[in-house]
Structures are given as C-alpha cells and as structure tokens.
Amino acid sequence: MFRGVYEHQIDAKGRTSLPAKLRDTLVGAYDERLILTTALDRCLHAYPVREWEALELSLAKRNPMEPGVKTLMRLYVASAQECPLDKLGRLLIPPTLRSYAGLEKEVVWAGMVKVIELWSREGWAKAQEEARQEATSADVMKVLAELRQA
C-alpha cells in the first residue's frame, strides 16, 4: 500500500525520482513500471501496471456509450502512458502530463493506498486546504467510522 507525502525536484527533461519508500512498495509488490494519467483534480495518478490493467478490465465490461464511462475513458484512459523507472529510480513524465498538472520544478508525491498522486507544490497545498475544510463533513466522518468497524 502506498502512503506518505514526499517532495522532490523535477529536472528540465521532466524526470523526477520516485521516493524510496514508494519505490520499495512498487518494486516489492509489483514491478518497476507505472501508468501515469490525468486525474479529475489538477494532478496525475500513477498506477502500478497490474492495478491499471485491473481498472481497464473492469471498465471494458461497462457500456462504452454510458455517459460516465465514455467521459472516464476520454479523460482518464486516453491520457494514460506507461512510464518505467530508469536505473536511478527516476520517472520521465511526458510533457502533456506535466503541463496538465502544472509540474515545473517541484513535485509532491502522495501515496493513496493503491495509487500515487503527483501534484505541483501549489496544487497540493490547495488540495490539502480543501480536504481539511471537508474533513469535518458528516460524509467523511461516516466513512472513517465505517473503516474503523471493518
């Protein structure tokens, strides 16, 4: 499971290092490949290939003309690109994905259980502030209570 928040630099070529703890989880449970795609928030999602393929298989069983399915395919699947780690544990983020998420000099990696989010530093700060405002909502508290009982 991916967890934790890590700040890293991104170089002029668009490479950034996958944080060691996230890399250990990736290599230990999967392999050294990630699928990067645009998220609905202004960030990127990084899936281990096996998790991504499971998502695609589930999606393939759905009616592609269903509005939510078609939109998900256009926004999420069509943008997806496989990005293997190099020998130094770096990931080359394609220019279109960097542009979408506003990744320039600093990136924030956020472990989200089965997926990793990549944010610009500013985007992450804004998302955290929004999450803190929502954290007091009844819906969030209900989910947390359900998880504690499971």
UniProtKB/Swiss-Prot annotation:
Q: Please list the GO biological process terms of this entry.
A: negative regulation of DNA-templated transcription initiation
Which keywords does UniProt give here? Cytoplasm, DNA-binding, Repeat, Transcription, Transcription regulation
Q: Keyword Magnesium, does the record have it?
A: no
CDD domains found in the cross-reference section = MraZ_C (cd16321), MraZ_N (cd16320)
Q: Which GO terms describe its molecular function?
A: DNA-binding transcription factor activity; transcription cis-regulatory region binding
Per UniProt, residues of the SpoVT-AbrB domain are: 5-51, 80-123
Pfam families from the xrefs? Answer: MraZ
Q: Which GO terms describe its cellular component?
A: cytoplasm; nucleoid
Which InterPro entries does this entry report, sorted A to Z? MraZ, MraZ_C, MraZ_dom, MraZ_N, MraZ_sf, SpoVT-AbrB_dom, SpoVT-AbrB_sf
List locations, semicolon-separated: Cytoplasm, Nucleoid
Chief localization class?
Answer: cytoplasm
HAMAP family reported in the protein's UniProt record:
MraZ
Q: Check the record and name the PANTHER family matching this protein.
A: TRANSCRIPTIONAL REGULATOR MRAZ
Homology family:
Belongs to the MraZ family.
- Subunit record text: Forms oligomers.
What is the name of this protein?
A: Transcriptional regulator MraZ
